[in-house]
Amino acid sequence: MRSDTIKTGFEKAPHRSLLKATGTIHGKSDYQKPFIGICNSFNELIPGHAHLQELGRIAKEEVRKAGGVPFEFNTIGVCDGIAMGHIGMRYSLASRELIADSVETVAEAHRLDGLVCIPNCDKITPGMMMAALRINIPVIFVSGGPMKAGHTPSGKTVDLISVFEAVGQRSTGEISEEELETIEENACPGCGSCSGMFTANSMNCLSEALGFALPGNGTILAGDPRRNELVREASRRIIDLVEKNVRPRDILSRSALLNAFALDFAMGGSTNTILHTLAIANEAELDFDFSELNGLSAKTPYICKVSPATMDVHIEDVDRAGGISAILHELSKIDGLLDLSVPTVTGKSLGENIKNAEVLNRKVIRSIEDPYSATGGLCVLYGNLAPQGAVIKTGAVSAPMMHHSGPAKVYDSQDDAIAGIMGGDVHSGDVVVIRYEGPKGGPGMPEMLSPTSAIMGRGLGDSVALITDGRFSGGSRGACIGHVSPEAAVKGPIAALRNGDTVTIDIPGRSITMEVSDEEIADRIAGLPAFVPKIRKGYLARYAEMVTSANTGAILKTPVSCEPK
């Protein structure tokens, strides 16, 4: 066992003395057992994590029953909703790398034999997953579960996005202060990851397809007794995974990655999933290119439409309809789309996991013969505005905006854009451009939920597009095109755009262009001053110096001194 490094032999007497002092060692026989890290992310700032302390307790109890010695430790976490619209959002994506590094540090420093990872919200799941693949010791994931959708006294279904959009409605006088307060009070009824197919739930669903989590991980509600049982089962499974030395890189193959992307496209997951899955693939040293996504999307039908694409369906409805296993089972009917032979943490193949799944509600999970669209709910656009690509959640775009051409309304920061939108400077037909908000420019590639919600709340969702080198919340809807690469801070073409330039978006044609000649773009770029970093000290300054482009997952580049020669 790896943990023998810190517990076996007379030389390790000091180590054992310290371990005993933790109160976790119950006797000498514990030194013969695997040491299992319970990698929790409990904190009281994130509603999706406020209940995880109890799940950690259950995991420790079950690991000990199964023959292991549990050691719980925590990672940090950022609530994207609370961090939204201010400097805090610049720390959100950057926290993914901190989480990965911290999990790596604890597991390696203490020679843990395996991990039970308990994430839930946006950057915590991919951060833990990146660490798992980096250290490559047996790991199983079990998330905290989704929040229930809210309901107003009148019976209207609401969620967090309803509140953001209600702010825009309040700014126009469409709703009263009292109506806004009613939505605010009822949108988030309890703990759990926000209730739609936003980033957190998207990643927890993808964990099933990747093979790292048990069936049900993505959809069983936080308050459901089945969630506690899922934690118990996962905590028992880790002992078997350790004994058989089944490691993350044994599970995550290129085929498993393609399975996850197919699921992502079929359920219209958050655009952030592409960013995170590319980063995960990088840690696994898998050869996968951003440009491959459109080919897979073209053969994957969009069969499960969930909030924010529609307010009629939330994650709890997907669970009642059969969950992720039912979606995968439906997709398995398409010859060659899924590789059902890939292994999973259940000890069975993906095909064995889903063979008995069935769709229980065709209004929630459609058949492959009757999809919302024949192609997936996410795609990549290319053109002279985004030579290295840009991402859009097609499943949340209204029909009138699938093709759009209009004058650019350019803002060099999210704050300026919000002020412009709320101040009435954006009109029907415009293309709002928010730049210098990419991985380096932001820094941290902040999400644009506030401006997109303002556009929707002001009734412009069917007539205004938004383009950015930043990101979007999984809760954004409308013609929201993000991850524009290269970003403005490295003098990508988006930096050349000027107010009034015509921008043309053709989503079915997968293109995004500005009606400016290549020569004019080059001249404008040549005349730009050098980008001045917005933050010059602390973690974000270091992050901005090392982060790479969105089309490679916004991972941190390896310092030159660490590169193999």
From Swiss-Prot:
Q: Which residues does the entry assign to the active site, renumbered to this chain?
A: S473
Q: In which pathway does it act?
A: Amino-acid biosynthesis; L-isoleucine biosynthesis; L-isoleucine from 2-oxobutanoate: step 3/4; Amino-acid biosynthesis; L-valine biosynthesis; L-valine from pyruvate: step 3/4
Q: InterPro entries given for it? A: Dihydro-acid_dehy_C, DihydroxyA_deHydtase, DiOHA_6PGluconate_deHydtase_CS, ILV_EDD_C, ILV_EDD_N, IlvD/EDD_N
Q: What is the lineage of its organism?
A: Bacteria, Pseudomonadati, Chlorobiota, Chlorobiia, Chlorobiales
- UniProt similarity note: Belongs to the IlvD/Edd family.
This chain belongs to which protein, by name? Answer: Dihydroxy-acid dehydratase
The entry marks the following residues as binding [2Fe-2S] cluster, namely C121, C194
Give the note describing cofactor binding and stoichiometry. Answer: Binds 1 [2Fe-2S] cluster per subunit. This cluster acts as a Lewis acid cofactor.
Q: Which GO terms describe its biological process?
A: isoleucine biosynthetic process; L-valine biosynthetic process
Q: EC top class, in one word?
A: lyase
What keywords appear on the UniProt entry? 2Fe-2S, Amino-acid biosynthesis, Branched-chain amino acid biosynthesis, Iron, Iron-sulfur, Lyase, Magnesium, Metal-binding
Please give the function described in this protein's UniProt entry.
Functions in the biosynthesis of branched-chain amino acids. Catalyzes the dehydration of (2R,3R)-2,3-dihydroxy-3-methylpentanoate (2,3-dihydroxy-3-methylvalerate) into 2-oxo-3-methylpentanoate (2-oxo-3-methylvalerate) and of (2R)-2,3-dihydroxy-3-methylbutanoate (2,3-dihydroxyisovalerate) into 2-oxo-3-methylbutanoate (2-oxoisovalerate), the penultimate precursor to L-isoleucine and L-valine, respectively.
Q: Which cofactor does it need?
A: [2Fe-2S] cluster; Mg(2+)
Q: How does it assemble?
A: Homodimer.
Binding of Mg(2+) occurs at D80, D122, K123, E447
